[in-house]
Structure formats: C-alpha cells, structure tokens
Design a protein with these regions (language model features):
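FAD-dependent flavoprotein oxygenase/oxidase catalytic domain
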Residues: 1-148
C-alpha cells in the first residue's frame, strides 16, 4: 500500500519512479514525523519522583541528527546529578528527589534541547520545501536568506 501511494502521489523525475517500481514492497517503509510543543517545567514538576528524558521529554524530527545525542546527554547529566546530590550523607531523602535533583536537571535539559527541537522542526520544513530542490553552487542557507 505504501509503495502504491508513493507512486500515485508523487511526480518525481526519472529514474526515481523506475527505482520505486523495481523495489520490492517488503523493502519500502515509512513512518510519520510528529512535532509537538515543548514541555514546560511546570508540567514536568507534576511528576513528583519521576522525570522524562530523550524523546519522551523533547521529541524531534530526524532531520537534524540530534535526537539520540540529546537523549544520551540527558541520561549522562541526570546520572551525574543523582550521583552528586544523592550521597548517603546528603538530606535528599528529606527534601525529596524533585527538589534535590529533578527541578534543576529538567530546567537545564529543556533549555539545552529547545533550540535543537526548533532547529529539527525548521530542518523538516526546509527539507520538504521547494528551496531544498534549488540547484546552485552555493549553500542552501544562502538561498533561504535570499528567498525568505
């Protein structure tokens, strides 16, 4: 069904239609790309002893190559904060993990990832626009600035 739809809905130049036609349907896959508004610190704070990292906290389209990088940074920074602030001698149990670790961690994570999420959404829009097909001997960013 996906192959059929791709062939029906697109008007690509040769040889792309021929390549699609020659490709086995079992070798064609697709998946939707979703964007959503950034989460807020207020929303995350409702998880008293719970936080989100990676795509659960800041999903981004795969057009900037930052999703896995940000998820790894989230995990590393959260682990470092827990190691640093939840020592047996600290009072984190009395004040709670949210105040001890999660609030500061989430604030940093949301700030750091916000530009990556926005840049990924912008890249998705750009890569699905006519400007992406512009032929020329210059960076595409120059074309965007001229036409934008």
């Amino acid at each position: 069904a996906l192959k059929e739809e791709a062939c029906r809905r697109t008007q690509w130049h040769n040889p792309i239609p021929q390549i699609l036609a020659a490709t086995l349907e079992t070798q064609i896959s697709g998946y939707p790309v979703y964007d959503r508004e950034l989460l807020t610190s207020e929303l995350l704070s409702k998880g008293e002893n719970t936080t989100l990292i990676g795509d659960a906290a800041h999903p981004m389209s795969p057009f900037k190559g930052q999703g896995a990088n940000q998820a790894l940074l989230d995990a590393l920074k959260l682990a470092r904060e827990i190691t640093k602030k939840c020592k047996p001698s600290s009072n984190w149990r009395e004040i709670g993990i949210r105040k001890s670790v999660l609030t500061d961690f989430e604030s940093e994570m949301l700030t750091r990832s916000a530009t990556k999420v926005k840049d990924s959404a912008d890249a998705a829009k750009f890569l699905h626009s006519e400007i992406a097909l512009h032929e020329g001997n210059e960076p595409r960013g120059s074309v965007i600035k001229r036409k934008g």
